[in-house]
Each structure stands twice: as structure tokens, then as C-alpha cells.
């Protein structure tokens, strides 16, 4: 280990690359590729999305190495409430999706999907409202300020929204929108993809901070950022496997205060996972690490060209840590 960073050869000896098929298209993908590290302290997950270049993906590798090689922080709770995650499916498919989140009292609904209309979003959100009392929406920065104002009005015509997650792309747009709508604004990409993750908070551009462990560099780094934020925090998944979900649960469990359900229920989006799928009980997940099953690792192993691509990526990111 050099300067606290494990040796590259040791990491590569412990590496497994998997391809997880998804039930529905999510973030434009139908197969989720990622690398897992079987480390001395536990399993780590490196799942930076394939379009991310090494300077951005390096934080995700740091998160994986933290999980694999360093002791975990203490948890303050043994269960974490989660939201159901509803992709940009038709309203007719909403019951099928929600069935995978038993007991969930909060749902996050994807909106502003390219190729879809605001009417599609309204129909999907209203279908969710029939089964789940608390609804939040996530636009992934897909609206302009004016579009977001229109969408907020349409999406609240038949019921309240808990918040709009990343309705616009920039901090300036979020601040402008926050002054024009009554629905709370949550920031995600404006935190995890920013050089200064605290800028959106200092700019009073958000009411809620959505924090994701892997993009921020690990649980310790996420908790450090959380300690500097004076607005409520929601811990969310970056489309993680059960291994990454375990780290998100640990981070949420280590927060002094947790007012909102967390976005850590995305395991239901996979056809298969590297460990036994986590099933919510009364809308909560137990705080415990996931240990991949060897048979599942073998069955879900990525083809050799993709394995080599991930090995090359680990090497490139390791050089930047």
C-alpha cells in the first residue's frame, strides 16, 4: 500500500467484473456493468458509468477501495427507510414496478425522459399516487427553468410532491427555480458531479441534498460532506449492485439524523444480482453488508473483452488516486 492506496496488482488479483441484466431500461441502459473487489475488509464496488472518463471515475474507485480495505464506520441505526424507484415506464406498468417494493411509503419517479412528454410524466406520477402516499420526482437535470415551473404545476395538480430532484442542470437554474415554485428542490448531480459539492448549498439553491457514496469517493468522504450541510440529506444509490447498496445503507445508518426515505431500493431494477436480493420489510432495509455468492459471480461474469476494458479502467483510475 502506497500513501494509503492499495497496490494495483493486489486490486487486480481480487477483481470480479459482472454484467447485471435489468428489468427495464434505466438511465438509457439495459445491462449494468461493474467491477467488484474482494478485499480484506469486505467487498467493494467500482461502478462508474461507462461514459465517465478516469478523472471523474477515480472517485468511484476510491469508494470501492475504502470498502474493500478499510474498517467500516459505526452505524447509529439498524434499518433504513427506502423509497420505491419507478423508471420512466408507462402508467400501466407502475403496479408491476411497485410490487418489488413491499411496504414502501415513498416513491421516486423518473421524469423528463427524452422522447416522452409531460403528459406521460403526469400519468406515471398519478398512477404511483394510487398506491404510495409520498411521491418525489427526479428529472436528472432535464428541464429548463420555465419547463420545470410548468412541470411542477402539472405534477402537483392532483397531489403534493415531496420534492423535485435535480429539475435543472445548473446551480444557477436551481436557485432561480426555487424562487418560482413552492415544491422543495433537491440537488443530486449538482453535488456529486461538482468540483465543489457544497456550492449548491451555499447558493441556497436546494432544500434537500441527495448524496451518493461512490461518486463522492466513499462513506467517509460522504459523511464529511454531510457534516458541512445544514439541510436534510437523502442517501441514494448510483444504480449499485447489492454490494454498493450495502455501503449506502451503512452511510445512511451513520448519519446523526435521517428525515427522509433513502433512494437505496434500486436492487429491484435488476433481473439478477451478485447476492441474494434485499427485500424491504415495512418499507425498510436492514443495515448489513452484502457478500456475493460465488455461483452468481460466475453466472453474471462479463465477457472477456468487457472484463479487460474494466481492468484497463481500474489501472487508469488507480493512477489518479
Swiss-Prot record:
Gene3D superfamilies: Enolase-like C-terminal domain (3.20.20.120). Pathway: Quinol/quinone metabolism; 1,4-dihydroxy-2-naphthoate biosynthesis; 1,4-dihydroxy-2-naphthoate from chorismate: step 4/7; Quinol/quinone metabolism; menaquinone biosynthesis. SUPFAM superfamilies: Enolase C-terminal domain-like. The active site is at residues 110, 212. Mg(2+) binds at residues 138, 165, 188. Its EC number is 4.2.1.113. GO terms for biological process: menaquinone biosynthetic process. Keywords: Lyase, Magnesium, Menaquinone biosynthesis, Metal-binding. This is o-succinylbenzoate synthase. It comes from Mycolicibacterium smegmatis (strain ATCC 700084 / mc(2)155).
Amino acid at each position: 500500500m502506497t500513501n494509503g492506496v492499495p497496490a494495483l496488482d493486489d486490486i487486480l488479483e481480487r477483481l470480479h467484473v459482472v454484467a447485471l441484466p435489468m428489468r427495464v431500461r434505466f438511465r438509457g441502459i439495459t445491462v449494468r456493468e461493474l467491477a467488484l473487489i474482494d478485499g480484506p475488509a469486505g467487498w467493494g464496488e467500482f461502478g462508474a458509468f461507462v461514459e465517465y472518463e478516469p478523472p471523474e471515475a477515480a472517485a468511484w474507485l476510491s469508494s470501492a477501495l475504502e470498502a474493500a480495505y478499510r474498517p467500516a464506520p459505526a452505524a447509529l441505526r439498524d434499518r433504513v427507510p427506502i423509497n420505491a424507484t419507478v423508471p420512466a415506464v408507462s402508467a400501466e406498468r407502475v403496479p408491476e414496478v411497485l410490487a418489488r417494493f413491499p411496504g414502501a411509503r415513498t416513491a421516486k419517479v423518473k421524469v423528463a425522459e427524452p422522447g416522452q412528454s409531460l403528459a406521460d410524466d403526469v400519468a406515471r406520477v398519478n398512477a404511483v399516487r394510487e398506491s404510495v402516499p409520498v411521491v418525489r420526482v427526479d428529472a436528472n437535470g432535464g428541464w429548463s427553468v420555465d419547463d420545470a415551473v410548468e412541470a411542477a404545476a402539472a405534477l402537483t395538480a392532483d397531489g403534493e410532491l415531496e420534492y423535485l430532484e435535480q429539475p435543472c442542470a445548473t446551480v444557477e437554474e436551481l436557485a432561480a427555480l426555487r424562487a418560482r415554485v413552492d415544491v422543495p428542490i433537491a440537488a443530486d448531480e449538482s453535488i456529486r458531479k461538482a468540483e465543489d459539492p457544497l456550492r449548491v448549498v451555499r447558493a441556497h439553491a436546494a432544500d434537500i441534498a441527495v448524496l451518493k457514496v461512490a461518486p463522492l469517493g466513499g462513506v467517509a468522504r460522504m459523511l464529511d460532506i454531510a457534516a458541512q450541510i445544514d439541510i436534510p440529506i437523502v442517501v441514494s444509490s448510483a444504480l449499485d449492485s447489492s454490494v454498493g447498496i450495502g455501503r449506502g445503507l451503512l452511510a445512511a445508518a451513520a448519519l446523526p439524523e435521517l428525515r427522509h426515505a433513502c433512494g437505496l431500493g434500486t436492487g429491484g431494477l435488476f433481473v439478477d444480482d451478485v447476492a441474494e436480493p434485499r427485500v424491504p420489510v415495512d418499507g425498510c432495509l436492514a443495515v448489513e453488508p452484502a457478500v456475493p455468492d460465488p455461483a452468481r459471480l460466475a453466472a453474471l461474469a462479463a465477457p472477456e473483452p468487457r472484463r479487460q476494458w474494466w481492468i484497463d479502467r481500474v489501472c487508469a483510475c488507480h493512477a489518479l488516486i
